Amino acid sequence: MKVESVVKEETKKPERKIKLAIAKPEDYSNKNVILEKEEELICPVCGSKSIIKDYERAEIVCEMCGCVLQQNLFDVGPEWRAFDHEQRVKRSRVGAPMTYTIHDKGLSTVIDWRNKDSYGKDISADKRAQLYRLRKWQRRIRVSDASERNLAFALSELDRIASKLGLPRNVRENAAVLYRGAVEKGLIRGRSIEGVAAAALYAACRRCKVPRTLDEIAEVSRVDRKEIGRTYRFISRELNIRLAPTNPVDYVPRFASELKLPGEVESKAISILQKAGEKGLTSSRGPTGVAAAAIYIASVLQGTRRTQREVADVAGVTEVTIRNRYKELTEHLDIDVTL
C-alpha cells in the first residue's frame, strides 16, 4: 500500500506542474498549444525554473536536466513579423477586436447594403432579391430576443451621446461595461434606457478622468439633468462604484483648448489649482467654476487675456461664479493680477 501511494504521488506531481504549460480548454480546442504568455514553469524532476521552448522540435524542455515537459505543440501565433503598429494592422488577417460597445461584442457579421459583387459590378435582380432576404434574416439572427434588442438600443444611444461629446474609445468601452453590469443586476427595470445609458457614460467619464458635467450630458441626451444624477447615484451604489470627487485640473486642458490658449497658460492654471488644492480652496466648490477662474487668472498673468464672458461660456458657468472664485484664489494665494 505504501509503494502504491508513493507511485501515485510521483505520477500526480508532474501532471500538476506540467499543466501550467497547457492552454485552458475553454480557450483552445487543442491542448497542445504554445502560449505567448505563460506562467513560470518548474521542472518536476530537478525543480529548475530554467525552461526553454524548442520551436524546431515543438517541445518545452528543462534546460538543466533535459526533461521534456510537453511535446507536439502547435504555435498559434502569426507566421509574419511586425515592427510597429502600422505593420501589425496591415499584415493581420483577422477581424476587429472584441468590443463591449456592440450588443454581440462584434462577433457577428453584417451583410453590406450595396447591391454589388466583389468586383464592384451591379448584381442581377434575382440575386438582389436573395440578398434582401439574407439581410433581413441576418438582422433577425443578430438580435434574437427582447433583451438583446434593448441592449442594442442602449449601446447605440450610448455611442450617439459619446460621439456628440467627442469622448475617446476607452470611455465608451467603460460605459458599455457599466451598462452591461446594470443589466445583469436588473437595475434597468422601472427606469428609462436612455437615463441609465447617460448615467453610465457620466460615471465612465469620471472614472477615466475625462470629465463631462451633468449639464453637458443632459444637453445631448433625451434625459434631464435631475434624472441622470439620480440614476447615477443609484447605479453607483448598487454596482459599488467608488469615485473620487472630480479634480478641477481635469477640466483645464479641454477649456484651454476651446479658448485657444497656449500651453504656458494651461501649465500656469494647473499650478494655481494645485496650490489651491493644498490650501483646501477647491473642496465643496464646483470644479468647473474653480477651473474657469484659474484659467482666467492664468490668461491675464501670461498676457493672453480672455474675457470672463468667454471663459464662462466655455466652462458652462456664470460670470458671477468666475468672479467669486477669482477673488478667493487671488486673496488666499497672494496673486497680484493687474486688470
Curated annotation (Swiss-Prot):
| GO cellular component terms attached to this protein's record | transcription preinitiation complex
GO molecular function terms listed in the Swiss-Prot or TrEMBL record: DNA-binding transcription factor activity; TBP-class protein binding; zinc ion binding
Zinc fingers classed as TFIIB-type: ranges: 39-70
This protein's source sits in the domain of life called Archaea
Spell out the InterPro entries in the cross-references: Cyclin-like_dom, Cyclin-like_sf, TFIIB, TFIIB_arc, TFIIB_CS, TFIIB_cyclin, Znf_TFIIB
GO BP annotation list: transcription preinitiation complex assembly
* PROSITE patterns referenced in this protein's UniProt entry, alphabetically: TFIIB (PS00782), ZF_TFIIB (PS51134)
Q: Which UniProt keywords apply?
A: Metal-binding, Repeat, Transcription, Transcription regulation, Zinc, Zinc-finger
Protein residues bound to Zn(2+): 43, 46, 62, 65
User: Is Zinc found in the keyword set?
Assistant: yes
Q: Tell me the protein family, please.
A: Belongs to the TFIIB family.
- Sum up the protein's function in the record's words: Stabilizes TBP binding to an archaeal box-A promoter. Also responsible for recruiting RNA polymerase II to the pre-initiation complex (DNA-TBP-TFIIB).
Quote the protein name from its UniProt record: Transcription initiation factor IIB
User: What gene is this protein translated from?
Assistant: tfb
